[in-house]
Amino acid sequence: MKYNVMFFGTPEIAKIVLETLFNMPEVNLIGVVSQPDSHFDRKKNVVYSPVKQFCLDHDIKLFQPQKIKEIEEEIRSLAPDIIITCAFGQFINQGIIDIPKYKIVNVHASLLPKLRGGAPIHYAILNGDLQTGITLMHTIKKMDAGNILFQRSLAINEQTTTKILTLELANLGALMIKEHFLELVKSDLVGIQQDENDVSFAYNIQKNQNIIDFNKPAFFVNRFVNAMYDKPIAIMEYNDVLIKVHQIKITNQKSTQKPGTIAISKHQIFVSTQDFNVELLLIQLPNKKPLAPKALLNGKNPFSN
């Protein structure tokens, strides 16, 4: 038996879940809803989201409303049996929540009730959590507060970046949808209520929240850079130049200078923190490609002033 399925999502993590649904024999993918185009390249050409590009490549019916409520009647006319969502980026109104027979199931990238919100992967790393995971949950009007249906965890280490963890969680979420789909399309699936006493939040990273604070200990600075990679990427300011910091390494050198002080040794760049120096391994000047310090220091750069 095939089930009529709609999918709501936008970024790469959502595309991987969508691709799995598209290839499942029990799924009839009747439509996808994604955020409106909002990214442009240097030539001001529109850059399609991963989900939109997948839909265009596979001739899938796509909706991009400014607000999801605008297409409520179109969704109703498609009569989805179930709606799957992942990193969609809009609140879903009650009218749409009530449409599918088997409800809306959200693929959320945390072990709920921890880290409700739009940036759970960033904050799992920022918080120094030892594990995170995927929660399949029923969507209700309150953000990420619906009943937990299935959960599975993944380990996090000090080298884990948001880019790496996003891919791992995307693959895990896709696998869980594949394994549990026939259970999700059962009317008697209720799940477990979330414990409101254990709730924490992971709101979207805002502008200027990606600036490195070298007054923090080195372990936190390293964690921060990992959490911001590869979006939005951590930044530091030096000689009035904003520098993107892609990768650093904690050294065993005790910091003897004021936090944020730069020291250059041959082809290496070090920055002092609250306790230990960190070494910049991959950095990027404005409108340039990311470079290792050895290559960057050979040319014109803010560190030679």
Curated annotation (Swiss-Prot):
Catalysed reaction, written as an equation: L-methionyl-tRNA(fMet) + (6R)-10-formyltetrahydrofolate = N-formyl-L-methionyl-tRNA(fMet) + (6S)-5,6,7,8-tetrahydrofolate + H(+)
EC number(s) given by UniProt: 2.1.2.9
SUPFAM superfamilies reported in the protein's UniProt record: FMT C-terminal domain-like, Formyltransferase
InterPro entries named among the record's database cross-references: Fmt, Formyl_trans_C, Formyl_transf_N, Formyl_transf_N_sf, Formyl_transferase-like_C_sf, Met-tRNA-FMT_C, Met-tRNA-FMT_N
Gene3D superfamilies named in the record: 3.40.50.12230
GO molecular function per UniProt: methionyl-tRNA formyltransferase activity
Keywords (A to Z) from UniProt: Protein biosynthesis, Transferase
Keyword Glycoprotein annotated: no
Protein family according to the UniProt entry: Belongs to the Fmt family.
Classification via NCBIfam families: fmt
Protein name: Methionyl-tRNA formyltransferase
